[in-house]
């Protein structure tokens, strides 16, 4: 449809019809204009799969039987693969399933930076590093939108905590904003070509992000040239005038008084009174019609989509296999050796995780690790289970109306206290004794511990990094009983591992890994799959070591000071040389890789490099070659190292391959707040290649001078 035809449609609309298109007329849809052939715009939550069907005017399920969908790995799990192909695959699955369910916009991916281990929505996000976020988000977005479904990248911007999320002021300096918190969104717009974007709940520099002039008008539309649709977070609009003037296109909320939304009757009244020009509404409607045209909603020629197909399940399994991170494997404990009896311990071995706030879905099925091990081992091995702990009794916010109630700013924190009764304490100790006895009686034991969606959950943050439900006591007892016990951690955020990290000989980490996650875990534990996942965040030794807690504020009060500036995650730990439990980018394999022959070449558009990687072991495996840049800091204080590239390469035993990479000049830049631009200062830069930020194998230096034709202002 030409732009002329779109404007012709707008001229035919009444004020009321325009208003109907720019705010929710149901919990997850706007109103169309039937007489002009304009349909409603249907949306759905979707980070881990298309959400179950809800009532039109409340959050209760419809109770239909045709809304079972595929359960995808969380964004944190996708990021653990460090593989752009897997991100693209998950985007394709999500886009196809959204179309199959009749949705136009899928509210994903979430790409906010992980600032603190305690944020309840970390599992929905990707990483503490903006480059990894950008590189994984772009193919995911493209995969979604190839299916005639619009991605809705969220939450723009600085939604880094759930505590007081509706009104908290994120106080961050411009350099940190530009270097850390915005690059993922910029990549989503410029490279991913996302068609829609969701504003955040929080405030930034005095204005709520859903109608923040600086973020939406100056940066998003002005600097980045975004020409898509901006959608509010549900209940994130607070001012009719700002919403009209500052770049918001669609207001959604959690309540059913649709005509009372800021961009409904109140906006219509302001237009009729002359306070707001109708041309502002026309621009919003134009953006929505352009979106509909791009999705082929107006011409009838559109992909139909599908859900719960075998192809989707196979793609999810492949992603889940690559998302598992081997943290420790002392003495080659893994893969598990053939035995007659295998002890499987821990509630997370048999727990299903397809949920967590707006990530909750209605999964067709979910394979737990216990199921996966039994499937893989068949009748040859007796797989014996002991729960070890139980999560009964914790406070839950997973209820039908939790989202509507979330606007009441409940002072709820995710923490575990237990019910404290004598009977409960007796039962807890019985579970530990039973688990320890089982571990002692079996040659092999795997203990599944970690979090669940009572702790990794929208609407609340954790109070600490400790494992809930008395798991630390369980771990100690099981390791006392069997020192060869493998610890398998399931969590969407870093957890405190100090009680077992030195004692356990083998530790495996997995985020919420989708409907095939349990099978993928079994395959890795048994050696059917060689693990190749890497951590997308740092696991610190103590919460107080984290920069958001030691330098900045978390969760703060009405305002949260990001005093740590650009020193977030490994940027802080590496610069301050602070020891961590497991560093950013860490992940082991069942084989060994060697690095050599690093060569760098200076060209007009950046530094080009090549490095030789060899599989020195006896099994095939995949290696993630990570490239970091560090400045000597002669003129500007910079983090010690920053991720600027990565390549995942699959190698057969004995195979050697040259891995190529490119570092554009912006990879060497920082944001100059005085000049309000990125620039490359004169300095000596280290190009570091290795397996993680803490395991650098090769280093070469690059000198960039002030008058160097290749230096100066970033390109």
Where are these regions (language model features)?
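Glycoside hydrolase catalytic-domain context in secreted enzymes
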Residues: 1-673, 679-694, 701-703, 710-715
């Amino acid at each position: 449809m030409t732009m002329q035809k779109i404007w012709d449609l707008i001229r035919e609309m009444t004020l009321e019809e325009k208003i109907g298109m720019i705010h929710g007329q149901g919990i997850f849809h706007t109103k169309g204009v039937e007489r002009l052939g304009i349909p409603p715009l249907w949306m759905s939550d979707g980070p881990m799969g298309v959400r179950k069907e809800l009532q039109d005017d409340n959050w209760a399920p419809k109770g239909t039987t045709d809304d079972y969908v595929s359960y995808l790995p969380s964004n944190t799990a996708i990021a653990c693969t460090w593989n752009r192909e897997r991100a693209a695959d998950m985007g394709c699955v999500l886009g196809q399933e959204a179309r199959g369910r009749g949705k136009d916009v899928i509210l994903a991916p979430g790409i906010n930076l992980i600032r603190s281990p305690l944020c309840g929505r970390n599992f929905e996000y990707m990483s503490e590093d903006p480059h990894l976020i950008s590189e994984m988000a772009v193919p995911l977005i493209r995969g979604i939108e190839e299916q005639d479904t619009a991605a809705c990248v969220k939450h723009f911007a600085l939604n880094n905590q759930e505590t007081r999320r509706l009104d908290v002021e994120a106080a961050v300096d411009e350099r940190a904003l530009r270097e850390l918190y915005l690059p993922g969104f910029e990549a989503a717009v410029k490279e991913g070509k996302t068609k829609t974007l969701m504003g955040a709940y929080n405030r930034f520099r005095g204005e709520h992000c859903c109608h923040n002039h600086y973020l939406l008008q100056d940066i998003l539309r002005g600097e980045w040239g975004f020409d898509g649709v901006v959608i509010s977070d549900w209940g994130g609009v607070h001012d009719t005038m700002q919403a009209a003037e500052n770049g918001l296109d669609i207001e959604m909320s959690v309540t059913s008084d649709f005509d009372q939304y800021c961009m409904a009757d109140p906006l219509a009244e302001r237009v009729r009174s002359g306070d707001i020009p109708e041309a502002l509404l026309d621009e919003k409607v134009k953006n929505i019609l352009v979106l509909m045209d791009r999705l082929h909603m107006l011409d009838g020629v559109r992909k139909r989509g599908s859900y719960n197909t075998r192809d989707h399940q196979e793609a999810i399994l492949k992603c889940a296999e690559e998302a598992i991170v081997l943290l420790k494997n002392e003495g080659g404990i893994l893969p598990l050796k053939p035995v007659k009896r295998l002890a499987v311990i821990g509630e997370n071995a048999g727990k299903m995780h397809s949920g967590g706030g707006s990530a909750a879905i209605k999964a067709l099925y979910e394979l737990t690790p216990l199921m996966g091990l039994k499937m893989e081992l068949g009748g040859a091995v007796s797989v014996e289970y002991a729960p070890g702990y139980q999560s009964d009794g914790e406070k839950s916010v997973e209820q039908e109306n939790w989202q509507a109630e979330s606007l009441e700013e409940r002072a709820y924190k995710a923490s575990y206290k237990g019910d404290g009764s004598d009977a409960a304490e007796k039962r807890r100790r019985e579970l530990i004794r039973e688990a320890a006895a089982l571990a002692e009686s079996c040659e092999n034991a795997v203990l599944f511990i970690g979090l669940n969606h009572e702790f990794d959950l929208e609407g609340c943050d954790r109070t600490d990094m400790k494992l809930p439900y008395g798991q630390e006591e369980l771990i100690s007892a099981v390791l006392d009983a069997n020192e060869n016990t493998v610890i398998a951690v399931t969590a969407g955020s870093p957890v405190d591992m100090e009680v077992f990290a030195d004692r356990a000989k083998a530790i495996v980490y997995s985020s919420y890994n989708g409907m095939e996650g349990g099978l993928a875990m079994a395959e890795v534990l048994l050696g059917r799959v060689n693990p190749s996942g890497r951590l997308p965040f740092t696991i610190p030794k103590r919460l107080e070591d984290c920069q958001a807690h030691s330098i900045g504020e978390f969760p703060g009060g009405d305002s949260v000071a990001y005093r740590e500036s650009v020193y977030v995650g490994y940027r802080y730990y590496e610069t301050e040389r602070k020891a961590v439990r497991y560093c950013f980018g860490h992940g082991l394999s069942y084989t060994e890789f060697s690095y050599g022959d690093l060569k760098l070449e200076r060209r007009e558009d950046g530094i080009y490099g090549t490095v030789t990687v060899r599989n020195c072991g006896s099994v095939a495996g995949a290696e993630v070659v990570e490239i970091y840049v560090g400045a000597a800091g002669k003129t500007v204080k910079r983090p010690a190292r920053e991720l600027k590239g990565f390549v995942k390469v699959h190698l057969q035993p004995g195979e050697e391959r040259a891995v190529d990479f490119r570092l554009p000049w912006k990879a060497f830049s920082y944001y100059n707040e005085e000049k309000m631009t990125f620039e490359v200062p004169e300095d000596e830069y280290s190009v570091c290649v290795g397996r993680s930020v803490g395991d650098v194998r090769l280093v070469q230096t690059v000198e960039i001078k002030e008058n160097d034709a290749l230096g100066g202002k970033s390109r």
